[in-house]
Amino acid sequence: MRRIFLFDENSLNSSSTIDTSSASTIDTSFASQCTNFSSGQASGTQDTHAGIFEDCPGLNPNDERVVELQCEIREKCEALTQDPEMGLILGEALHAESDNVPFLQSIADDLTQNGVSGEAFQEALNIVGQAAASPLDQFEIVPLIPMHIGNFYFSFTNSSLFMLLTLSFFLLLIHFVTKKGGGNLVPNAWQSLVELLYDFVLNLVKEQIGGLSGNVKQMFFPCILVTFLFLLFCNLQGMIPYSFTVTSHFLITLALSFSIFIGITIVGFQRHGLHFFSFLLPAGVPLPLAPFLVLLELISYCFRALSLGIRLFANMMAGHSLVKILSGFAWTMLCMNDIFYFIGALGPLFIVLALTGLELGVAILQAYVFTILICIYLNDAINLH
């Protein structure tokens, strides 16, 4: 059913031009609407009168008047938005492929008479906002508490909020299983879970890091344990609907991987001094090949930190995007008023459930991979492998 606007006999013959005063009435609320197109947050009105939902048969598609009206609609949208690109998008969203002259004329008249507050313009915002919705919107960082300090801008975002929630949950969990927090000799379910994770990471450190006594290995254990639990809880928290996946952002995973890798490099220098650079040149390498191998090993060593962060970011972002896409597809089919669409949606729905289970496994696996690679890199720095 094609949407059209109410029109009368006078509006069909109207040749009035756009009122430039409408463009000057665009305020900050409209500007905020335009900036929200990509996130699907554009607001709009849905009038209750029947005119906008009426159907009108098309006229001659070769009529030059159709082309004139379509161009006029685009020009009016450009004038209202003061943005040629956005005006083109809104204009095409309104007239689409319609060849209905009264329909197009009513749109042009509404834009002329009512400007940005009119039914036509608000309908364009709705159409563009719905079309611009993206599976990547779930990764948008939204400022919750903006803060300005001089020329610097700081803000407490949704990413900061969920990182604090993760750390708070982690600290409370650790506190409640200690003696001061009420831990029992006979462990309860939470205490058993924490002890299981503790033993798992402890065994990982003992197996992967060689050349050190047990007491020295204990120096690195707290950092590795906290890193593993932080990543594990961040990944699992991202599976909760309407939450935020902290590890789906490259800057966060990159900052974590580089900070840890710099610490590992410092440990290597503390243990070996300048002899630490000897890992760049394996023993027995011919002298002519030495410069190339040193450069190659140096690039390989530096890219360890980059790959460590990219691996986590890419896996979490790709998995969540795929679940979002298939969920939207299944939901659209379920909302169709047709039994065949409903039955056809069962397939994507089962795939979404399977992918959700797979994402839970990926969330745990990526925390494990990140942790074991830290242990391997630390072992290489200590033993110069």
From Swiss-Prot:
Proregion span(s): 1-133
What would be an example GO MF term here? proton transmembrane transporter activity
Cited PROSITE patterns: ATPASE_A (PS00449)
- GO terms under cellular component: mitochondrial inner membrane; proton-transporting ATP synthase complex
One Pfam family this sequence matches = ATP-synt_A
Cite the entry's keywords alphabetically.
ATP synthesis, CF(0), Hydrogen ion transport, Ion transport, Membrane, Mitochondrion, Mitochondrion inner membrane, Transmembrane, Transmembrane helix, Transport
Transmembrane segments annotated in the record for this chain: 154-174, 220-240, 249-269, 276-296, 316-336, 339-359, 362-382
What InterPro entries does the record tag this protein with? ATP_synth_F0_asu, ATP_synth_F0_asu_AS, ATP_synth_F0_asu_bact/mt, F0_ATP_A_sf
Where in the cell? Mitochondrion inner membrane
Q: Tell me the superkingdom of the source.
A: Eukaryota
NCBIfam families assigned to the protein according to its UniProt record, in alphabetical order: ATP_synt_6_or_A, PRK05815.2-4
Family label: Belongs to the ATPase A chain family.
Q: What is this protein called?
A: ATP synthase subunit a-1
From the broadest rank down, the organism's phylogenetic lineage runs: Eukaryota, Viridiplantae, Streptophyta, Embryophyta, Tracheophyta
